[in-house]
Regions:
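N-terminal low-structure segments adjacent to metalloprotease catalytic domains
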Residues: 1-70
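Auxiliary, metal-adjacent structural segments of Zn-dependent hydrolase domains
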Residues: 52-110, 123, 163-174
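Short pre-active-site segment immediately N-terminal to the catalytic Zn-binding motif
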Residues: 115-129, 148
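Active-site recognition of the HExxH zinc-binding catalytic motif
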Residues: 128-141
Length: 204
């Protein structure tokens, strides 16, 4: 596991959040942006950089890195076992963790990078985001191959974590129609491809 954080990373994160803001709002996601950011600045990376530098506190990221590293050491064996168990999943040999204080709670970029928001929850609970986004990376190639709906994808990740970590982490809410994937999951896990092929689709 490797960590990265810098003002440069934060500028990129803020711009990406602004670009996807409409989608995030329509899907009920919470996200954070620098204080004082105006709509007129939304495409000006230099003015965004200035706002970020005013707020940037390296200690916040260092505390988060320490907390995640400690939790990772206690969980990496199980995460590797899950990866090996998931049929045809992407092998996550290494993980690049970019720490941020902006955007949503977490996100991922193939093949092996995740972004974790360190300001949304206490440091000792950040491992839940790391685990969640890591599972996303493992299953994303199959998600794309089978054209799986966003909320079905989220539910599959939640179900994997709930089962393998014995309900240690809270499951995030999904639309009601998605819950029907639970029965398919119980029947076919850990065969992801079968789960995805038999999973529900967005109601028309």
């Amino acid at each position: 596991i490797k960590f990265q954080y810098s003002v440069k990373h934060e500028v990129k994160r803020v711009i990406n959040t602004i670009e996807t803001r409409t989608w995030l709002i329509s899907n009920g996601y919470r996200f954070s942006l620098p204080q004082g950011l105006q709509d007129s600045q939304s495409s000006e990376s230099e003015s965004i950089r200035e706002l970020i530098q005013k707020e940037y506190n390296k200690d916040l990221y260092e505390v988060a890195e320490k907390a995640i590293s400690k939790s990772w050491n206690g969980n990496c064996k199980l995460i590797k076992e899950i990866n090996e168990k998931l049929v045809d999943s992407h092998n996550l040999d290494e993980l690049n963790v970019i720490l941020t204080k902006y955007g949503t709670q977490g996100s991922y970029t193939q093949p092996n990078s995740i972004i974790v928001n360190v300001s949304a929850i206490p440091p000792e609970f950040l491992i839940s985001t790391v685990v969640h986004e890591s599972i996303h990376l493992m299953i994303e190639p199959l998600i794309k191959k089978n054209d799986v709906d966003h909320w079905v994808k989220e539910r599959i990740v939640n179900l994997i974590i709930d089962l393998e970590f014995k309900s240690r982490f809270k499951m995030s809410p999904v639309p009601e129609w998605v819950v029907s994937v639970d029965g398919v999951f119980k029947q076919y896990y850990p065969n992801l491809e079968l789960i995805m092929k038999k999973a529900p689709h967005v109601p028309s």
